[in-house]
Amino acid sequence: MSISYVARIINGNSEVGILDQVREPTLKIFVRTIAQIHVPLRTTTPRATQYRALSTQPNRACTQQTSSILATTPRALHTSCARDRDWQAPKPFKRRGGGRSVQNNPLASSHASEPVANDPFRHLSQNDYARPTARPQAYRSKTGDSGGREQRYKPAGGARKPRRPNPESNTQGGNWAEPKTKEPWRIQKEALAKKFPEGWKPRKKLSPDALVGIRMLHQQFPDEYTTETLAQKFEVSPEAIRRILKAKWVADPETEVERQARWHNRGKQVWTKWAALGKKPPRKWRAEGIVRDPIWNEPRGPNHKDKAARAEAQRREAQRRLASGMMG
């Protein structure tokens, strides 16, 4: 009889009780059918027995690791040896309600005893198929149980290997060594510095009128206009003045006309650029039509009227000071 059936009878529900009386025979037949079903026991293979034996007993790697850890910890943290060994022996499993243990269970004993007789690996010891041992410890501790600061872990290999010296570094001076091959621009720069210690001064081109003027000045005043003086005046080297004075070449009339025309056009180009930058050209080139922009002609400083007014104000201020000094 079900619990619901008894509860309903107690509550006085007679109609529901009649329906439960009709269902009770059917429920009994169902329970009897389930009781006749036979569930075969699960057979274990030799490999499963092997794994079960390994799971109940600690391996060698676990034992070594535990012993190394216990050796390095302080004594205050150690527990008794008997308590530490208790975990190695498998204990029977007990239920909370105080039921039967695994040792008294017939099914568990049958599972553990049946495959032993048919085990093909029974001639081998447990250590033969045990798990591989752990890798050697990378760190080791000094003698002693205390974990003080002086007894820290140190590498098993000893001191570290020294680093390989860098061949490119200069160990004597501490600076980086210069490359063996220099860049082309560096080679050219060093060559120019060696050839021109005072800096690069390109040769200045002199007009035909300047060449004639140099010869005439040196011929008329040789003591006053020497080679060094002419070099400073015309901003060329003394060697260039010496070559100009030494030259005896005189151009014919046609070549002279071409030279004058070429230098005249060159003067126009040069002063056109200067006028664009705001520089006032000489009268010769202004007559040729080379003038600067009108915006550059606006007076930016004080003009003549401002100068006259400022001078008149200064004169009056001086008279006033003189009169006040005489009166006082």
Curated annotation (Swiss-Prot):
Compositional bias of kind Polar residues: 101-112
Record PANTHER family: NEUGRIN (PTHR13475:SF3)
Keywords, in A-Z order: Mitochondrion, Transit peptide
Reported function: Required for respiratory activity and maintenance and expression of the mitochondrial genome.
Disordered as annotated region, ranges: 81-184, 288-328
Highest taxon in the source lineage: Eukaryota
Record field: compositional bias (Basic and acidic residues): 301-320
Protein name per the record: Required for respiratory growth protein 9, mitochondrial
Family: Belongs to the RRG9 family.
GO cellular component labels: mitochondrion; nucleus
Pfam families the UniProt entry points to: Neugrin
Source species of the chain: Chaetomium globosum (strain ATCC 6205 / CBS 148.51 / DSM 1962 / NBRC 6347 / NRRL 1970)
Gene symbol of the encoding locus: RRG9
Localization (cell): Mitochondrion
InterPro entries recorded: NGRN/Rrg9
